Swiss-Prot record:
The keyword Protein biosynthesis applies. It catalyses: GTP + H2O = GDP + phosphate + H(+). SMART domains: EFG_C. The gene is lepA. Required for accurate and efficient protein synthesis under certain stress conditions. May act as a fidelity factor of the translation reaction, by catalyzing a one-codon backward translocation of tRNAs on improperly translocated ribosomes. Back-translocation proceeds from a post-translocation (POST) complex to a pre-translocation (PRE) complex, thus giving elongation factor G a second chance to translocate the tRNAs correctly. Binds to ribosomes in a GTP-dependent manner. It comes from the Bacteria. PANTHER family: TRANSLATION FACTOR GUF1 HOMOLOG, CHLOROPLASTIC, TRANSLATION FACTOR GUF1-RELATED. Belongs to the TRAFAC class translation factor GTPase superfamily. Classic translation factor GTPase family. LepA subfamily. It is a peripheral membrane protein. Keywords: Cell inner membrane, Cell membrane, GTP-binding, Hydrolase, Membrane, Nucleotide-binding, Protein biosynthesis. One of its GO terms (biological process) is positive regulation of translation. This is Elongation factor 4.
Amino acid sequence: MNNIRNFSIIAHIDHGKSTLADRIIQLCGGLSDREMEAQVLDSMDIERERGITIKAQTAALMYKARDGQVYNLNLIDTPGHVDFSYEVSRSLSACEGALLVVDASQGVEAQTVANCYTALDLGVEVVPVLNKIDLPSADPANAIAEIEEVIGIDASEAVHCSAKTGLGVQDVLESLITKVPPPKGDATAPLQALIVDSWFDNYVGVVMLVRVMNGTLRPKDKILLMASESQHLVESVGVFTPKSISRDTLTAGQVGFIIAGIKELKAAKVGDTVTLASRPAAEPLPGFKEVQPQVFAGLFPVEANQYDALRDSLEKLKLNDAALMYEPEVSQALGFGFRCGFLGLLHMEIVQERLEREFDMDLITTAPTVIYEVVLRDGSILMVDNPSKMPDPSKIEEIREPIVTVNLYMPQEYVGSVITLCTQKRGIQMDMSYHGKQVKLIYEMPMAEIVLDFFDKLKSTSRGYASMDYEFKEYRSSDVVKVDMLINSEKVDALAIIVHRANSQYRGRAVAAKMRELIPRQMFDVAIQAAIGANIISRENVKALRKNVLAKCYGGDISRKRKLLEKQKAGKKRMKQVGSVEIPQEAFLAILQVDDK
């Protein structure tokens, strides 16, 4: 066991985490040169295209060190994005060490810091590595100073390397072996294995990726999953060297996979403890929690007959994404669809993109909302994740909205514009500190302001240099109202939005104006109104198309013309009573594009 090292790589997006992993795998001969491809651990197309890691992957590698011994290095690849922070914390608690990869030309970024603090909290040994040292703009001294100042670990011996050219990758592995402690654990104790990740395979069912803490596991053992309390018979165990290779046993300190013919992913939750049914462990490993969705949106098929197909696709996605929640929803405007819950905006985009790409769905998505706590007059509390479910204002005592703590990092020159943006979004500044050329801001902000477009705006005001991460703090009483959109005095439920009262006038007006551009002219007048309760706060009209009924009158009496005009007017009035307005697809997206000026 002294020759095992379990480690993961912490890095911000684009700091070279996947490339470094590729080099390490190549150096240890995990894959032959023929099988090697860029970003070998990112298995989904979307992961490759966006250059992000979504699911955790592992590789068990054999490395012959300079001291002549052969070490078994287990690389556990973690997601780097803040939406997936729970998965990151599970991956990290399966390791004894982590490589902190920092781009020598850019310095420390927000998500690196967030994940690095998680690692230090879990007692993981952090080994700093400076990547992209071959770039002409690389400034190692500055990067080292930033690591020491922002994160507070000694970086004087940080390894310099370039994952692209392969320079210094061996030094990275050597420092890993000397600095990271071997795993502790007792191979004879009752089995405890942490589920780091799980996914669904069409042939064998659920594959669980585990780190064995104590005990030994063999095929034909009966296992018990402690959180879901289900029992299964182990069919095979093994390791990934990215390729899966079956083994006879998995013992304490090792990282590998278990296949036990489990049919649904709900049984194998990330962070759960696997133990033997015949000799269970006294208690589960700490840190397990159910993942709660934070952001909600309605997904509706463009064609009504696609509803069943959408349900099937969501079921298949759910097999591989335990955090995705969905329930059927009916909207008067959009027909049948689903209300889906996501971990965050990136998660939502990925799910949408996978539905469109892998399952060929055409979707309409409503504006994302967060969960509000609504206290009614009779003292009961409702959790509302959908504007159309908001009760009547007369019954509401108060509405509480989720507040998050946001950590922002940016170069000094952008501080002003970022502070302005945060104030616009109802942020309250809690702290501000300078670290070299970097500034760290801490804000408390309503989550509702973040889910719409905060991230995009932050990137554009800071030219892409600012980075952020956020975590939920509490529910806080707030003056938010529901704005309904009425078309010809009928409410359209899919267009309702929940906004702060201060912004409600502006938002209502802006959405109405946008709708006016998007709804095509009909044969009759269309009135678009925004209302809070019974108060109309704005109105726009789409003028009717009309035929020139006077074309056939040359000269002649005015009463003749008036008669024709009156007749046309009466016809339009009748038409308006029975006519229904087709709302085009773009109108639903209009809500997302209304900027808070």
